[in-house]
Amino acid sequence: MIELKHVTFGYNKKQMVLQDINITIPDGENVGILGESGCGKSTLASLVLGLFKPVKGEIYLSDNAVLPIFQHPLTSFNPDWTIETSLKEALYYYRGLTDNTAQDQLLLQHLSTFELNAQLLTKLPSEVSGGQLQRFNVMRSLLAQPRVLICDEITSNLDVIAEQNVINILKAQTITNLNHFIVISHDLSVLQRLVNRIIVLKDGMIVDDFAIEELFNVDRHPYTKELVQAFSY
């Protein structure tokens, strides 16, 4: 379970980015955080990950095995390491897997799942496309077998086929390894395919919180309706 109680946060004392955030996410629930750029979505993710501490309020996680997948994969990889080295480091660090043969077998299985060529493993991060690197980024996090996954705009660099591939993989992982994941996105179609609950942020505050089946209900917050209408164009 993830629980935020009256969480307030600001990068300086004059302006709060998030104000009085109250969220409870039970095990097994996948949640999308929806809102425009600058509304506090990524800051909220950073707080859950423990990268920042709230100015006020409390954050509780029942499981400490929480990992992020960030929007820009190039900043998530060591530029001097091959893709293979970075992936195997995750297997060693998070799972204690040191046997090279076992590591290779896991990598080959995941390469097939993510529809990536094994020849790319010898490349540096700067030598593969942004879409390929983002798929490797997702792969690395899943190889680490986290219980909670925080996904921050992870499909922004992917074409539509690769995007659906990653979504299918994450949905399958929900059944196997993950307790739940939180998806930060401005793309409503991604959230509709991935989560069963949406929380809407506006100006650092929660203005709506509903099950995905209730997205088009007439009693949705006016801002939620505005986002839905904007996306439909």
Swiss-Prot record:
GO terms for cellular component: plasma membrane. GO terms for molecular function: ABC-type nickel transporter activity; ATP binding; ATP hydrolysis activity; transmembrane transporter activity. It is found in: Cell membrane. Induction: Transcription is stable during the exponential phase and increases only in standard conditions in late exponential phase. ATP binds at residues 35-42. It is a peripheral membrane protein. It comes from the Bacteria. Residues 2-228 form the ABC transporter domain. The keyword Transferase does not apply. It is an enzyme of class 7 (translocase). It catalyses: Ni(2+)(out) + ATP + H2O = Ni(2+)(in) + ADP + phosphate + H(+). Its EC number is 7.2.2.11. Disruption phenotype: Deletion of the nikBCDE operon strongly reduces nickel transport and urease activity. Mutant shows decreased virulence in a mouse model of ascending UTI. Insertion mutant shows attenuated growth in several infection models. One of its GO terms (biological process) is transmembrane transport. Keywords: ATP-binding, Cell membrane, Ion transport, Membrane, Nickel, Nickel transport, Nucleotide-binding, Translocase, Transport. Belongs to the ABC transporter superfamily. The complex is composed of two ATP-binding proteins (NikD and NikE), two transmembrane proteins (NikB and NikC) and a solute-binding protein (NikA). Part of the ABC transporter complex NikABCDE (Opp2) involved in nickel import. Probably responsible for energy coupling to the transport system. Required for full urease activity and plays a significant role in the virulence of S.aureus during urinary tract infection (UTI). This is Nickel import system ATP-binding protein NikE. It comes from Staphylococcus aureus (strain NCTC 8325 / PS 47). The gene is nikE.
